[in-house]
Amino acid sequence: MDKLKVTLIRSVIGRPQNQRDIVKGLGLGRVNSSVVVPDNAAMRGAIRKINHLVDVELAK
């Protein structure tokens, strides 16, 4: 199964609580922190809700 590398590129300051919860749930903390997650429907749905805050690329 493929994996996605998700990098937080914008701060969650001033964002709604549901977006903050998604960022925290993915394991992202500070700006420029990255995490590798499985490429499945649940992760893609979470990433879609915060796509303006993160950068996503295929992990090698």
From Swiss-Prot:
It comes from the Bacteria. InterPro entries: Ribo_uL30_ferredoxin-like_sf, Ribosomal_uL30_bac-type, Ribosomal_uL30_ferredoxin-like. GO terms for molecular function: structural constituent of ribosome. Gene3D superfamilies: Ribosomal protein L30, ferredoxin-like fold domain (3.30.1390.20). Pfam families: Ribosomal_L30 (PF00327). The keyword Hydrolase does not apply. GO terms for biological process: translation. Keywords: Ribonucleoprotein, Ribosomal protein. One of its GO terms (cellular component) is cytosolic large ribosomal subunit. Belongs to the universal ribosomal protein uL30 family. Part of the 50S ribosomal subunit. PANTHER family: LARGE RIBOSOMAL SUBUNIT PROTEIN UL30M, MITOCHONDRIAL RIBOSOMAL PROTEIN L30. This is Large ribosomal subunit protein uL30. It comes from Ligilactobacillus salivarius (strain UCC118). The lineage of its organism: Bacteria, Bacillati, Bacillota, Bacilli, Lactobacillales. The gene is rpmD.
